[in-house]
Amino acid sequence: MSKKTFLTERQKTVLEMRERGWSQKKIARELKTTRQNVSAIERKAMENIEKSRNTLDFVKFLKSPVRILCRRGDTLDEIIKRLLEESNKEGIHVIHDSITLAFLIREKASHRIVHRVVKSDFEIGVTRDGEIIVDLNS
């Protein structure tokens, strides 16, 4: 496993112990600190992990050969149709079926889609591997 991460050694230790099923109280005793401190370390580690995931998604989106803009008023069905058509033009096989695509898009853009209709613009990218990246920063 790579040593270079965005996690401190203390965060790694706490996450490893939590993964083994240790309670925060037990970790605190072992590390000679408070349970509140263990909780704060774990919370900050999870924030760092989420930021890392967001960074990777951003880079994947930048490199996506297929990007479609989902505009206010577009329906989920229209978006999926355009997404699949544009992917086919690029020779990319999307790794999800239409039902799963609808679920993924609604899950990632839940506050921008109401009753299968886009309420505020966002973009979707498709990687060369057919992975879907929803970019809410547009």
UniProtKB/Swiss-Prot annotation:
Q: Which SUPFAM superfamilies match?
A: DNA-binding protein Tfx (SSF89915)
Q: Which InterPro entries match?
A: RNA_pol_sigma70_r4, Tfx_C, Tfx_DNA-bd_arc, Tfx_DNA-bd_euryarc, Tfx_DNA-bd_sf_arc
The alphabetical list of record keywords is: Activator, DNA-binding, Transcription, Transcription regulation
Q: Name one GO molecular function term.
A: DNA-binding transcription factor activity
Is the Manganese keyword given for this protein? no
One Pfam family of this protein, by short name? Sigma70_r4
**UniProt record similarity statement:** Belongs to the Tfx family.
Q: What does this protein do?
A: Transcriptional activator of the fmdECB operon.
Please give the HAMAP family that the UniProt record associates with this protein: HTH_type_Tfx (MF_00620)
Q: What is this protein called?
A: DNA-binding protein Tfx
Q: Which gene encodes it?
A: tfx
